[in-house]
Regions:
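ABC family nucleotide-binding domain
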Residues: 5-206, 211
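A generic structural motif
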Residues: 22, 218-219
Length: 271
């Protein structure tokens, strides 16, 4: 199989300039964050619980306001009414499917909410289900599907709007290891086909190295970026990549970064 390096555009799909978040109870969730993500990158936010990964992702989506600084998505403020909802999709930790509706109806919903003409909806839903291998399950209810298949429905629902930016908050964290590895590979295949920008949140160092073109390491109390690592390995990536010396070098680097950040946090709490 021919291996290629993914090319990314020079324009910033996401520009984060000093973004800060303090919750009403005074918790400093994020200290000022500076980060630029190029069009077509697959960037993973990695770190322990409480480091602000999900908070930052929701701020990029416009689901949480920025207290100070700014976040711009395709040149527009995050959450701006000028920003087309169609250009951004969010996949949550759980599939959040309507249990009374079929797989097909769940995937149709975003297009119906956007007012897409009914004649266009059917082919787009069919293509989204084909993308995740669920064409034969279109008329099934979610509770008849496994956890991995339900997450595939959630991914199809995200891609049916043809987004340019996909935000994913630990989508495979609750799945068994075999299913997680399979979905990681399928996600990379879709990303390479669509050439979109992905920001992915995980606790898993191995998942981050396998998926990413760049890993952003975060630490907690307050949430902040402590390291960035480019994964300069070609795509497509198979499971064999995970047992190579190169993979282990990347993983050890991130493990050491996480350990140093944890030590610094412990020292700060004792002082």
């Amino acid at each position: 199989m021919t291996q290629v390096h993914m090319t990314t555009g020079h324009a910033a799909a996401i520009a984060i300039d000093g973004a800060d978040k303090v919750y009403p109870d005074g918790t400093h969730a994020l200290q000022p964050v500076h980060l630029s993500i190029r069009q077509g990158e697959f960037v993973t936010l990695l770190g322990p619980s409480g480091c602000g990964k999900s908070t930052l992702l929701k701020m990029i989506a416009g689901l949480l306001p920025v207290d100070q600084g700014s976040i711009r998505v395709d040149g527009q403020p995050a959450g701006s009414p000028q920003k087309s909802d169609q250009s951004l999709a969010f996949v949550f930790q759980s599939p959040t499917l309507m249990p009374w509706a079929t797989v097909q109806a769940n995937v149709r919903l975003p297009l119906e909410l956007q007012g897409v003409p009914s004649g266009e909806i059917g082919p787009r839903v069919e293509e989204a289900l084909r993308l995740v291998g669920l064409q034969q399950f279109a008329q099934h209810l979610p509770n008849a599907l496994s956890g991995g298949m339900q997450m595939r429905v959630s991914i199809a629902r995200a891609f049916v709007t043809d987004p340019s930016l996909l935000l994913m908050d630990e989508p495979f964290g609750a799945l068994d290891e075999i299913t997680r590895h399979k979905l990681d590979g399928e996600l990379l295949d879709i990303w390479r086909q669509r050439q979109i920008t992905v920001v992915f949140v995980t606790h898993s160092i191995h998942e981050a190295v396998f998926l990413s073109s760049r890993v952003v390491m975060m630490a907690a109390r307050p949430g902040r970026i402590v390291d960035e690592l480019t994964i300069a390995e070609p795509y497509p990536r198979t499971q064999e990549f995970m047992v190579t010396p190169e993979f282990n070098v990347y993983a050890r680097h991130l493990q050491h970064s996480l350990f140093r950040a944890s030590e610094a946090q412990a020292d700060a709490e004792l002082s």
